[in-house]
Amino acid sequence: MADQNQVVRAAGVLMAISVLARLAGFIREQAIAAQFGTTMATDAYVVAYTVANIVYLIIGGALATVFIPVFASYLTGSNPVDAKNKNDYRQQNHLDRRSAWNLASTIINLTVLVLGGVTIIGIAVSPWLVQLIAPGFAPEPEKVQLTTQLTQIMFPITLLFALSMLFGVTLNTLQHFAVPALGSVVFSLTVLASVFTLGATWGIKGLAAGTVIATVFQVAIQVPVLWRKGMRYSLVLDLKHPGVRQIGVLMGPVLLGNAVAQAYVFIERIIASHLAEGCIAALNFANKLYLLPFNLFALAINIAIFPTMSAHAANNDLAALRKTTFGGLKLVGLLTIPAMVWLIVLAEPIVRLTFERGAFDDHSTGLTTFALSFYVLGLFALGAFNVLNRAFYALHDTRTPVLISIFTVLFNLAMALILVRYLQHGGLALAAALAANLNLILAYYFLRPRLPNWRGRELFAPLGKIVLASGIMGAGIWVTARCLIQLTGGSTGLMAQLLTVGIASSVGLIIYLGLIWWWKPDEELVEMVRKMGQRVVQRVRG
């Protein structure tokens, strides 16, 4: 119960802040859409951001994933590697945090050295990177030149994002979640400000510069909190620390898996660069909408439960790890399955309401809605897969997720090459959704024998009720939306879309909450949501 309350408190804090973060992020995307639309400049910005961000996603993402379990084991004094290296650290009391902070300082310094060097090299070879990732831009030299310049401006975010994530997961391990989550709010607000300041003066290049400034702020706000939590940074490079070696061993498979996953992102951009102008931007805007429920609900849950899962695994309490994993899966389903239905039924009015203004016209809405309708089919799978993935990582098993990723990326690529012929950019979105569902199926299959007392009925019975409640909710939303569209005469104006989305969503929410409360798919789940709701309200009220 104590672990459950800890997860609920953490998830509640994260969701409360996520409400602010997603609101800020949406206003940011609205501003970018209104200022630049689905134009050549936006396509160039998206590709440049991808090039600059991809190295961080490969290296920084892998580092953050394996750092939490190792760092947590040093904080709790239960690191199995240390027990085999008593000659090196015989006098070290791991309940004293000096060894943990020594490990953290070494990893931070290695990150600066490695990704700092990668940034310098990346800026130098940007012209070739752009040709590699967007060969379809070649017939338009102006577009290639602009993309190259934007890539060179934004390449420092490779290092800055990695530091931000490393600081964030360190604080998460210490059960502090608020400030790392607030980092995305600071990032979005800074980028938003740059749209109207630097962007208004220097166009898309100003937006690129503002993106870099935003990542600097995202890193900076976490430093004082780390210090208050007891971190004592030092210019140490202790490569003999057993934790460093352990991270190195664990990181290899994750690095490979991330590289494979990001290779697909490269390939997707290559394919999309050959499509009509605006398709890359439309995929980007649709992806932002699709990931809204994931970032707001599923990601918050995953971040909140990972330290708890790591602690259970470190203590070899596999029964508790299974229970936490099941709780995470059910909570993800409770929140993302109705969100899937909501986005499917109201896709077009949501896109119009969110983006259609300024340079983002009716054509842009059509492109974005088409992609969104396919992306959203993978929403629950994406959130649930992340829960299962973290269970593997908590068990220090990085090999299985990598093998799964390699297989599903190849599947994703094959589907994309087939579907893009018939659905254009929608084919890329559908391929991603199919791959997300395959990821979930494989992860479930391979994790099941690893944890004791795995009872599928305990998981699928409540999820079945959630699916049924979501379907009835979707029918209510559809009927309400059709009536409102008739009442407004099919108007695409802002107020008409606001009424349609607002009223239909409210009706759907009432139906869904009523059915969930009536059917009670899982008593423990309902209690967790009740506590989480109280926590969110408390945080929002301050």
Predicted regions and their residues:
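Membrane-embedded alpha-helical bundles of multi-pass transporters/translocases
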Residues: 1-542
